[in-house]
A protein has these predicted regions:
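Local cysteine-cluster metal-coordination motifs and their immediate loop/turn environment
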Residues: 44, 48, 122-145
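ATP-dependent adenylation/nucleotidyltransferase module used to activate substrates
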Residues: 1-117
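Short cysteine/histidine-rich metal-coordination sites, predominantly Zn2+-binding motifs
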Residues: 129-130, 151-158
Length: 158
């Protein structure tokens, strides 16, 4: 049975936020530091909404693609946070949240994507632009470094 992806708008939660993820920054011109891109409890919202929706339609597992990145210091990106949330959701509901890529680095993900012939040029994880990678936010820089690392490995092996 084929399932459709359901889009749930949660943007209204952050209408008063000063985060540059909401009030879009021009990272080529503006002076923006990583803290300016922080949205409090963003991942908590994503995972609890996905879990609530899953439980309401009888789906028992939610998959998350969080990886082990340098952003793991943020309170709702840490392994401890994910494990506590997972336990809470299992104890008070019927949904399990699974993190199959949690121990992957961005380079590991790029390597996997290339090995699966994913069109890497169509991927992005931009913190600022929802349509095309900005190329300068921390996630875009990490992505470019990861792809570069993988490609260097392929060149060495030829």
């Amino acid at each position: 049975m084929k399932k459709k992806i359901k889009v749930i708008k949660i943007g209204d939660v952050y209408t008063e936020s000063h985060s540059r993820m909401i009030k879009e920054a021009n990272l080529w011109k503006d002076s923006v530091v990583a803290d300016d891109l922080f949205l409090p409890y963003r991942n908590l919202l994503f995972l609890t909404i996905a879990s609530a929706f899953a439980q309401s339609i009888g789906v028992g597992t939610v998959y998350s693609a969080f990886i082990n990145s340098n952003h793991a210091k943020e309170i709702d990106c840490s392994l401890e946070f994910f494990m506590k949330l997972r336990k809470l959701l299992q104890e008070y509901g019927s949904v399990e949240v699974v993190f199959p890529y949690r121990n992957y680095t961005k380079t590991d993900v790029a390597r996997l994507g290339i090995s699966l012939t994913v069109p890497i040029d169509s991927t992005y994880s931009c913190q600022v632009n929802p349509e095309i990678p900005c190329g300068v936010c921390p996630n875009c820089v990490d992505r470019l470094v990861a792809i570069n690392n993988v490609m260097r490995g392929y060149i060495k092996n030829d």
